[in-house]
Amino acid sequence: MAYGEPYYSSKPDKDFNFGSTMARRQMTPTMVTKLPKFVRNSPQAYDWIVRGLIFPTIGKTYFQRVVVITGGLEDGTYGSFAFDGKEWVGIYPIEHLNLMSSLKLIHKANALQERLRLSQEEKATLALDVQFLQHENVRLKEMIPKPEPRKIQMKWIIMGAVLTFLSLIPGGYAHSQTNNTIFTDMIAACKYSTETLTENLDLRIKLALANITISDKLDAVRQILNFAFVPRAHWLRTVFYYIHYYEMWNIFMFVLAIGTVMRSARPGTDLVTLATSHLSGFRMAVLPTIPFHTTMTLWVMNTLMVCYYFDNLLAITLAILAPILGIIFLCFMEDSNYVSQIRGLIATAVLIAGGHACLTLTGTTTSLFVVILTCRFIRMATVFIGTRFEIRDANGKVVATVPTRIKNVAFDFFQKLKQSGVRVGVNEFVVIKPGALCVIDTPEGKGTGFFSGNDIVTAAHVVGNNTFVNVCYEGLMYEAKVRYMPEKDIAFLTCPGDLHPTARLKLSKNPDYSCVTVMAYVNEDLVVSTAAAMVHGNTLSYAVRTQDGMSGAPVCDKYGRVLAVHQTNTGYTGGAVIIDPADFHPVKAPSQVELLKEEIERLKAQLNSATENATTVVTQQPSAALEQKSVSDSDVVDLVRTAMEREMKVLRDEINGILAPFLQKKKGKTKHGRGRVRRNLRKGVKLLTEEEYRELLEKGLDRETFLDLIDRIIGERSGYPDYDDEDYYDEDDDGWGMVGDDVEFDYTEVINFDQAKPIPAPRTTKQKICPEPEVESQPLDLSQKKEKQSEYEQQVVKSTKPQQLEHEQQVVKPIKPQKSEPQPYSQTYGKAPIWESYDFDWDEDDAKFILPAPHRLTKADEIVLGSKIVKLRTIIETAIKTQNYSALPEAVFELDKAAYEAGLEGFLQRVKSKNKAPKNYKGPQKTKGPKTTTH
């Protein structure tokens, strides 16, 4: 029968080619058009199975074969479908491990492609939004009016020039004469020479008399520094030469005038203030008082300074009266404005009166300037109440923060010692297990999870509506299924079979919420925080500044036991939902027995209520109605008993059906326990108290350490281990249990199973056959041990000696040794063992003398041999437990090595190859070269 080409739904299906090729050849166009909706570009497995194994079939059609397709569907399920001739019918899924692995990878790749597509669409949308925003930004910038360059009016320029001219006129501050002649120059030169000579004479006299004062030393140092750091021909000397004609106020007023004209928002008011302060002579004393003034009080001050230029007494009188008049005439103002105006008038009065006093006494207002600055600093110091003050710009933005506390820069260890004090508390260590954490990745975002038992626990809002989520653990990605989500914000995921965490967290049996520890992975870094917690019903709150991605993290106590699952983040405090052991499993429906018990209680309650009503209220009813409605107590009890009897009978039948295989064995005479010490005699006795068990749990010990401690405590309580006879096996007595009590045995009868005891080969005749035996091939001789036989044994030997001699005479005959064919599986090196040497009876005392005296085991040899046996046993047990048999060759190697060191036969023997050479095979080509002959 000719078949068509194999059918492949896609290129991946052709590349993988899972299943039977013959089944693919059976595909017809009708079958192809009716195929289920498998995942696009995914492989399928085709099977050609007997019809009777799938559908109920009788007759010849039982052995007909049908095509079965297995693959992944678009809805995310895995299924198998068989074609019954009309359509594809779903059957129980056939597990193809390679197909399932491939579908898992394809599903993950499709999910990543979908996420990539959504990310690209989102990126394109965001890029378009950015372009729109850029265009809108450019359009709005064009709509903003550009500030015009500031124009300075000519009148202010002229006023500034006048002030500059006034400040630069030396005037009365010059120190040079106007009329200079040759005589005046000669007089000045002579005067300078005379002063210089006088200073030199005074200096020499002081040096001679040693009468040098501190002022003389300071003058000398100043001259040295002047000539050392400033050369004689330098531009600084020229600048200072011309500056000394002016006072500090002239220079300062010149700078202020230029700055006011260029940058001031009110140049007129500022220039008028500079001019009046210069004309009145108050000068620098005016500047510290300007912050206390308002616009009105500033013009009052300027007016009084102009008045002072003409009549100082009138100006002083008006300045003193100004605050009094202001208090009276400005009382209609608002409080804030009223206070500001009065403060400015008081500052004006202080300036005019104090300036006049300073000018009269000292001729300058420098002292008043210093006093006003000192008052301002004291006022600022009284404002510094907080630990720091903030400096803001015009928009209210904080540009700097200055601490008010005075910091000792040089000797600050005294302050630190005083602040630190003495430690009165000790912080405890907490147990954390980073290996029990993982990252939960969903299309909506990422969260944290932890391993507990066979589940992965996380927050329910992290999982969302997803049925499968990705679990990232130690750089690998796994897919886990959501198993159960209780009413709390908790989700339980089934741990994948190929995921083996290094640690797992356990629930706390005695929860302590006073101090909690939160640990999670944030940006692939482990973060841990400890804080005090408060309980609010089923939730916890703690002052921890948690971050996004920590939802689902475990909240543990100091022993590393889980208390709750992290849930919320408010920026300052974190919240968690408390987890209980009952949350791990869904609430089970009540069993049939419980339902019956509830029904009985309900019927009893109804019966009691009916009885009470019957005793309190009695009404006349017809006899027919009474016959229909009256129910006695006995009837209700009988109904309940009947229902309970039926249900209990059903329950007993089910239990008997389950226990039927175990009830067939009858009780008989057994020998269980014979030949060994009884075990578990202390079973049922508590070896650990409740306090000891709780203490071990609170220490957070792992399973191995916990078991070691229990074994140690049991050993101390018992005093000695249980003894077990190694030569006794329960399998030897299995046949006794099949015999009933009604069977009688004849214990004197000897049953022969045709299993004769082998007779050891005679050792004396061997010496006649082989007169010169080799030393290595001699059998082991136990004659070194002194013979100690009882009287009974000697009598038995004497009685059997004649029979033995007759048997030896019949057996001992010279037999010519013949060659025996080699065994198919035998050792190919060393001498053949003498098998007769192994055929002898020996007891425990004989075993001590098997080896010759020089080769007997010492205590050290026993220790070394015991360590090797323990090592081999550990390797084998570890391989069996972990199902990793790659270490077994190491055990075989150690066994061969020990046998080689002891001179014994190795565990592995080379087997002679059964491959025989062909009949005409001449062997390998000779490489020795041609033969050379000599003549």
Swiss-Prot record:
Its EC number is 3.4.21.-. It comes from the Viruses. One of its GO terms (cellular component) is host cell membrane. InterPro entries: Astro_1A, Astro_p19, Astro_VPg, Mamastrovirus_p20, Peptidase_S1_PA, Peptidase_S1_PA_chymotrypsin. Residues 922-935 have a biased composition (Low complexity). The chain crosses the membrane at residues 239-259, 286-306, 313-333, 344-364. It is an enzyme of class 3 (hydrolase). Changing V272I: In strain: Dresden. GO terms for molecular function: 5'-3' RNA polymerase activity; serine-type endopeptidase activity; serine-type exopeptidase activity. Changing S551A: Complete loss of protease enzymatic activity. Residues 756-828, 915-935 are annotated as: Disordered. The record marks H175, S176, Q419, S420, Q664, K665, Q755, A756 as: Cleavage. It catalyses: RNA(n) + a ribonucleoside 5'-triphosphate = RNA(n+1) + diphosphate. The keyword Cell membrane does not apply. Belongs to the astroviridae polyprotein 1A family. This is Non-structural polyprotein 1A. The gene is ORF1.
